[in-house]
């Protein structure tokens, strides 16, 4: 497994540097599966796929796996792009209502990558002063959002 981890880190380094891997051989079908499973667990599958898809060694990967991975990578990038767009539309609405949200992690960290939407994230974290919870909650609901676990008291819940 250490070899697969090292390959993943090498591919990630290539992606971050705007290059592709140049692996000639040495990866079995099982290795490719393990590499992309690990990449998926770390939410970097699109980045790793982007870095390796054109290397000679990738031609040894099973065609079905390649097609599945290509589909997953494209889907993940598209979904992340949509999430980013939704945040960028929601943020000014919060500000218009007098809120002072601060985006932390998520979009801020993704902006450090060459292709931001290749770094997927499960959600966006927005720091909101407690006294603005009700305003933000209202804006979220008006824009089609709902809390996963509705709380009777937003202040007590500590999140909206």
Can you name each region flagged by the protein language model?
Residues 2-9, 16-105:
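Helical scaffold of the NTase/Pol beta-like nucleotidyltransferase catalytic core
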Residues 86-141, 149:
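Active-site nucleotide-donor binding segment shared across nucleotidyl transfer reactions
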Residues 11, 18, 158-160:
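Conserved short internal alpha-helix adjacent to the catalytic or cofactor-binding core
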């Amino acid at each position: 497994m250490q070899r697969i981890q090292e390959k993943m880190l090498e591919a990630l380094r290539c992606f971050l540097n705007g290059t592709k891997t140049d692996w000639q051989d040495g990866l079995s079908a099982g290795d490719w599966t393990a590499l992309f499973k690990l990449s998926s667990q770390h939410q970097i599958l699109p980045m790793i796929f982007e870095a390796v898809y054109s290397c000679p060694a990738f031609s040894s990967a099973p065609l079905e796996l390649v097609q599945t991975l290509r589909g997953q990578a494209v889907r993940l990038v598209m979904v992340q792009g949509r999430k980013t767009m939704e945040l960028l539309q929601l943020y000014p609405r919060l500000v218009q209502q007098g809120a002072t949200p601060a985006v932390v992690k998520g979009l801020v960290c993704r902006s450090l990558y060459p292709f931001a939407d290749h770094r997927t994230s499960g959600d966006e974290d927005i720091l909101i002063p407690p006294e603005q919870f009700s305003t933000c909650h209202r804006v979220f609901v008006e824009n089609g959002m709902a809390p996963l676990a509705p709380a009777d008291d937003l202040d007590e819940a500590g999140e909206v």
